[in-house]
């Protein structure tokens, strides 16, 4: 090959066009087109052999040329690329050494590359090719660029095969995942912010519902009469009549409040609410009818013209006050209640159906809401023996006529005199109240009367109707005695009620069952199952004896795992073998503890132990309760019992077993308990009459 290069440099080489390269992008193929025979070859070695064998006369080959495959020439280069890719994959990918490693690789035609391929070296040795000379030429070409020959300047050089793209490294994949998650978080934040803006916009532009507007209009209509304004013409005469001449100037004065006595307690309350009026200096807002304005809740300015303060009230003097000296505020309450129409009184009964309103401050003249006493007034002295209410007590509520102030004052005076009576009169009144079952069981004292008086400032009831509730009526007493006599006579003659035969219930009373359980538990030393603090009531020697007995019983119980393990009990499968185990366990317990217990009593003890142990496990591990020292000691004796898995409950009347306490109790209640209703034909018991009658109709076909 060195001689060929020398000839090429001397210019003695004849360049002959042998063929063209044909490319088919559709089929993804490259072929060589022979210029002499017009034939196409898909492989380069095949094309070279064709030229040597078929067109040697034209090309004038002096001897046979050796032709190598491209795969053989490129095998070493591909192996080096694989080694380089492995080195790059082992590195972090961010060190920046890939370019240096590519520059450090030798050229495919160098001596270092050819020396690794044995076949190429043998072929070169057959033709006496100098490898070192080739290496020097390659180095000279790498360091100094040879000027192109004028004869070969128009030809293109062979291209080096391009490198395959490297797969992404681990760091590249991690960075890609991080950026993808960050983009997702940003998208979620934008979506949430848009939803938040939409919610805030809907809250700002929310229109008040028609139901709320209706409630607000009702509230405004109810309060329109209470807001300050000119008083009604119908109530003014009654106010002027009831008020005395000396007290009117004190009420009409707006700036000079009355002098209060510092030694006596006093109560201050407003008689008139602050008047809410539009400001005169403010101009009215003009609105266009064609534009629909949305209602906006704003606070209007309050213009308070005057505030009147009531004079102080002396409780001792008011209790003994005569009818002529009734204070002005009491006459206002009486007149306002008397002037109410029946329609207005009936509206208070519907107050329960209305939605709750905002509580407002009470005033001495305004009626804001109905009192709970008023709602209970129609239910006064409700009893089965009473048929009609007395006309005296219900006349005030039913009649709409205005009562004269003199009669009202007289009735109020009588009620106050009765409350301040002597002890003998109070005892007689108390005995009279006890005889009447329908009346109240207490008498009103002066403090209670004053409290009721202050609490009824805003209600639509007067004080007299409340005081009459505590007084027994003679007519009611006679009516009650007559009805009681009729009931006694009816019971003596015999009522048409259904009489059912009373059967003795097989289940023992609770006290007897508890005594029986205590006796059984005392025998085996397990009183802690019923009383967790029983050791505190006993001396030390006796408590130690109980602990020793319980330890013996638990040791024997531990050996019979087929009794306390539900899984092993089910594997036995035959009730006879389980009965044999219980009998042997009973005999061993009687022999070790020196007692005389039956098999049913042993079953009862085991059921009590399982129920108590399950309850203590629930308290300790699930409810995190602190157990006493004695309870923990006895729990340790039965540590082998299952804590979560099902345990064994034995029926004391039959041979059935159950995995939990609920099924055991249901079985006893439905099968072995004798109830009040028992079928005479089949002997089945029923807890309720409905099921007994249904059983008779469906099973025995009885009407």
Curated annotation (Swiss-Prot):
It comes from the Eukaryota. It is found in: Nucleus; Chromosome. GO terms for biological process: male meiosis chromosome separation. One of its GO terms (cellular component) is nucleus. Residues 148-161 have a biased composition (Basic and acidic residues). GO terms for molecular function: zinc ion binding. Residues 84-94, 138-147, 339-352, 364-373 have a biased composition (Polar residues). Signal peptide: none annotated. Keywords: Cell cycle, Chromosome, Chromosome partition, Meiosis, Metal-binding, Nucleus, Repeat, Zinc, Zinc-finger. Residues 78-111, 138-161, 339-434 are annotated as: Disordered. A zinc finger (C2H2-type) spans 32-55, 649-672, 677-700. InterPro entries: Znf_C2H2_sf, Znf_C2H2_type. The keyword Nucleus applies. The keyword Zinc applies. SMART domains: ZnF_C2H2. Drosophilid specific gene duplication generates rgr and tef. Teflon has a function unique to Drosophilids. Specifically required in males for proper segregation of autosomal bivalents at meiosis I. Expression is required in the male germ line prior to spermatocyte stage S4. May have a role as a bridging molecule maintaining adhesion to hold autosome bivalents together via heterochromatic connections. Belongs to the Teflon family. This is Protein teflon. It comes from Drosophila pseudoobscura pseudoobscura.
